[in-house]
Amino acid sequence: MKFFKFKKTNVVSLINFTGIIAPNMGRKKGLNIQDYNKLIEQAFQNKRNKAVVLVINSPGGSPVQSEFLADRIINLSKEKNIPVITFVEDVAASGGYWLACAADEIFASKASIIGSIGVISAGFGFDKALNKIGVDRRIYTAGKNKSLLDPFSPENKDDIKRLKNLQTKLHEHFISFITLRRGKK
């Protein structure tokens, strides 16, 4: 019988984040903490692990899921004392950049799209089209803000003000996270 000695080597775990960051909505799958938590935990489990590498190709998406994913990676990195490195493929924009900033270092091609620290909300207004064809919109609610920015009703200045306020708070939170993680890099 022959015996072979195997040398224990260092390990680097790799996690691919490709696509839109979003909660699961039926059959539509996005990058989210529900689907990636176990994978993230496994990446930090190996005792010979010298680093965890995030490969990101995402235009962003849900700020909530972006923050959940980034926080989980940051917390495990601190807990296990394992550095995190991000490689950006084509794009790490908005929530994709939020996720990339969970790393200690970020590497990208000169052609990669990185950044876009902002908040966007979009919709359509169908109220004039409905009026033109003689359709009345009827909404019955109990409580405030239940039909906020309803696309079938005319825009309401108070609704827009409330949305802008929410966007501003989220944008400030996003900027503070990036500043904390990236500093003056």
What do the predicted segments below correspond to?
Residues M1-N81, V91-W98, A103-K184:
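Small-residue-centered hinge/linker elements
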